[in-house]
Amino acid sequence: AEHTPLAALDLTGRISTAGCSVNDATPALIKLPAAMLDHFGGVGKTTGDTPFALQLDCNSAVTISLRVDGAEPLTARGHGVLRNDATDDRAQGIGVQLLYHRQPVVLNHEMTLGSASAGRFTLPLTARYYQTRSRITAGQVSAVATYTLHYD
């Protein structure tokens, strides 16, 4: 008996690890509104709350942790404040505070955010100006933070 092939069957697949990717809707640059010096009233005062979100697309259920790294001013350590690194016409005594669910982000430290199922996971954040010294001057404010996501 002779056997003749009737059809060829190509099978392809992909094996991947569980994880998430940052959605294109996540902003890379956050612009705070202009603020007047009289909006501040002493060390620790804030203004210019600007909500934004890190949006993740997850391919399966995962536990997500976030680490935000950035330079903290000596006068505001432990308050989630990033140092003002503007190079031209820099405002003095002002930094940028990051909040997650209205609480200061602990910089340079990993925090567990919770579990995400497959699909979209949104991390609500806020950036705002934060007075770091009693004497402040007007000028530009620029801060940089690097975030790293870990998932299990």
Question: Predicted regions: what is each one?
Answer:
Residues 1-152:
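Mature extracellular/passenger domains of Gram-negative fimbrial/pilin and adhesin proteins
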